[in-house]
Amino acid sequence: MSDLYIGLMSGTSLDGVDGVVVDFSGAHLRVLAHVNAPLSTALTHELLALNSPGTNELHRAALAANALVRVYAHVVAQLLELADIEHSAVAAIGAHGQTVRHQPQSFDGTGYTLQLNNPALLAELTGMDVVADFRSRDVAAGGQGAPLVPAFHQSAFGQPDQTLAVLNLGGMSNLTVLGPCPATESPAGVLDADPPSCFHSHDVLGFDCGPGNALMDTWCLQHIGQPFDADGAWAAAGRVHGELLAALLDEPYFAQSAPKSTGRDLFNSGWLTWKLEKFSSVAPVDVQATLTELTASVCATCVKRYGSESSTLIVCGGGAFNSHLMVRLQALLPRLKVISSQARGLPPLQVEAAAFAWLARNTLLRKTSSLEKVTGASGARILGAIYPA
């Protein structure tokens, strides 16, 4: 079996599709190619709309899934060209899909998670094996189905002599806390292809903190016509409104204990509109500053509660490029060193895509990937369904 895998990720931020080719042949994984492909405005709007109940949803969701998969196939073609490899050299594609509903419950029969995808079509378009549907087995086992990347974070960033925290700032924010890993001998910046021998669920904690970029991006698009706040410059020009921040923080989800997960089912434009009802006089730029402070505050609180022994906070995802947000995180966490994942050998936009390449590999090798302490499932499970070429 080949040691080359492709990972494809389109997250709740809806800022495009990230794809990577990863080589797992050596002691340490290597990313051979990375592509970021934007989604069309029409597809982005439809995927956003499908996060909420509407008319003719089944038909629209099927068409949106097909459209997304055609973007996936285009990304795969670009990756093969950049890496200068044939499709036959790749063992499988790990394709996450687009989460449009995430309502996990524990063992009561009502929990579900839905990622729009058509892995059969992707296998047909690429001529490659596809692994998809990574989350549903964990939900079936009573887990949250999210986050799934902490296991990968341990293999990629775990260190032998220190506790680390990894913060993914996508549409939502999720935190991983990694305990020391004595069996690891990899120096900082070197990424392990396989988990070290100390890799157990008790070494890793992970959960969704709350909103990441989603609310900030929504507000930006609505008021300045931009899909995101570049470098956080707009937020930096405003002032945090204390009463509005308190109202935003008055959300039961933030007080819940881990394991927990969330998404646009909760933190969406409707939630923001509701919270802003009593603050119509606040200038849009100050709302943006306050939304940025919300993300920073929620994430910092989670780090203090669950990762107080951490020496470093490694930030990945699109939010790592928001300079103002990174400054606020460092200010709220003065005892930690806040750095981009780039400093540890993996650029921020490659981390989640690489994680799904890693998860696909585990599926083919029949290795478990979920961590019961992270998701709350009844045990570790092999994740994903295989669609042969």
From Swiss-Prot:
Catalytically driven reaction(s): 1,6-anhydro-N-acetyl-beta-muramate + ATP + H2O = N-acetyl-D-muramate 6-phosphate + ADP + H(+)
Binding-site residues for ATP, renumbered to this chain: G11, T12, S13, L14, D15, G16, V17, D18
One GO MF term attached to the UniProt entry: kinase activity
Pathway(s) it belongs to: Amino-sugar metabolism; 1,6-anhydro-N-acetylmuramate degradation; Cell wall biogenesis; peptidoglycan recycling
CDD domains, alphabetized: ASKHA_NBD_ANMK (cd24050)
EC number: 2.7.1.170
BP-aspect Gene Ontology terms: 1,6-anhydro-N-acetyl-beta-muramic acid catabolic process; amino sugar metabolic process; peptidoglycan turnover
The keyword Endoplasmic reticulum is annotated on this UniProt entry: no
InterPro entries the UniProt entry points to: Anhydro_N_Ac-Mur_kinase (IPR005338), ATPase_NBD (IPR043129)
Entries under SUPFAM superfamilies matching the protein: Actin-like ATPase domain
Keywords: ATP-binding, Carbohydrate metabolism, Kinase, Nucleotide-binding, Transferase
Claim: Transcription regulation is one of the keywords in the record: no
Domain of life assignment: Bacteria
Known role: Catalyzes the specific phosphorylation of 1,6-anhydro-N-acetylmuramic acid (anhMurNAc) with the simultaneous cleavage of the 1,6-anhydro ring, generating MurNAc-6-P. Is required for the utilization of anhMurNAc either imported from the medium or derived from its own cell wall murein, and thus plays a role in cell wall recycling.
Family: Belongs to the anhydro-N-acetylmuramic acid kinase family.
Protein name: Anhydro-N-acetylmuramic acid kinase
